[in-house]
């Protein structure tokens, strides 16, 4: 994205991580604007949009990738846990897209939502993840329908098992609880899922960049699965 745009606005809760990513963006010659905000808070999305327009005057692309929903058994999830997961990943993305819609219309811009493969193969231990991701895919479709009229392109990505810091942390907690080493746990999932390896964040980033590029302008209302072949259904 930093290769394709002259400026990139970054919004997340972790200020340190934001600054690290902003430093990398800057090395490409692109101007970064890091905003330490919690997008689960109602007012945060308007702050992002207002600050972006004040600084750069336009919004060409919006990538909704914030949010992690807890992987807790279906019968152990509380209402508060459900609400917290939905508030950031689903409603945070919904609010940000609505607040930025007028600017996206003016720029004939693009929006991408990140869902997840749990929505296509729900399990009891991933019920909240699956439900939230399914809602995101449906939300993206609804925005895409409006986008046809308004000139805004909207799609979603359904990634599978990507080796992120969050996944490593999960494996470090999951492994001892199941009497195995982290190495064994890390190896176990791809074998059980029928995939050759974990995905890398850079691979998802390349797909994101393509979906907001001129090459993909006729793509809208589409959900693209990138999971190494984990989901076998048609």
Q: For the regions a protein language model found, what residue spans apply to each?
A:
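Short C-terminal tail/terminal secondary-structure segment
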Residues: 121, 209, 215, 220-234
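Catalytic loop of short-chain dehydrogenase/reductase
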Residues: 110-136, 140-149, 161-162
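Conserved glycine-rich Rossmann-like NAD(P)H-binding loop of the short-chain dehydrogenase/reductase
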Residues: 5-20
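A conserved structural motif in NAD(P)-dependent oxidoreductases
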Residues: 180-181, 193-204
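Alpha-helical segment proximal to the catalytic Tyr-Lys
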Residues: 102, 145-146, 217
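Short, small/polar-rich loop/turn modules that mediate ligand/substrate recognition or access, typified
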Residues: 63, 148, 153, 219-221
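Substrate-binding pocket helix/loop in short-chain dehydrogenase/reductase
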Residues: 73-75, 81-86, 189
């Amino acid at each position: 994205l930093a290769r394709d745009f002259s400026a990139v606005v970054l919004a997340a809760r972790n200020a340190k991580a934001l600054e690290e990513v902003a430093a990398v963006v800057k090395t490409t010659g692109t101007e970064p604007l890091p905003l330490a905000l919690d997008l689960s808070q109602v007012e945060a999305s308007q702050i992002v949009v207002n600050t972006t327009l004040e600084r750069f005057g336009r919004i060409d692309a919006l990538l909704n990738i914030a949010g992690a929903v807890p992987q807790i058994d279906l019968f152990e999830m509380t209402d508060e846990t459900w609400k917290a997961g939905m508030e950031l990943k689903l409603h945070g993305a919904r609010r940000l897209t609505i607040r930025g819609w007028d600017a996206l219309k003016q720029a004939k811009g693009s929006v991408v939502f990140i869902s997840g493969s749990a929505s296509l193969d729900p399990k009891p231990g991933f019920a909240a993840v699956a439900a939230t991701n399914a809602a995101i895919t449906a939300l993206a479709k609804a925005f895409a329908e409006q986008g046809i009229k308004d000139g805004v392109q909207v799609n979603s990505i359904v990634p599978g098992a990507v080796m992120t810091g969050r996944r490593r942390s999960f494996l470090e907690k999951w492994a001892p609880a199941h009497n195995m080493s982290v190495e064994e746990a890390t190896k176990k999932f791809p074998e059980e899922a029928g995939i050759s390896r974990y995905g890398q964040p850079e691979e998802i980033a390349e797909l994101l960049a393509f979906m907001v590029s001129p090459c993909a302008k006729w793509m809208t209302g589409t959900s693209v699965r990138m999971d190494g072949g984990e989901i076998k259904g048609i």
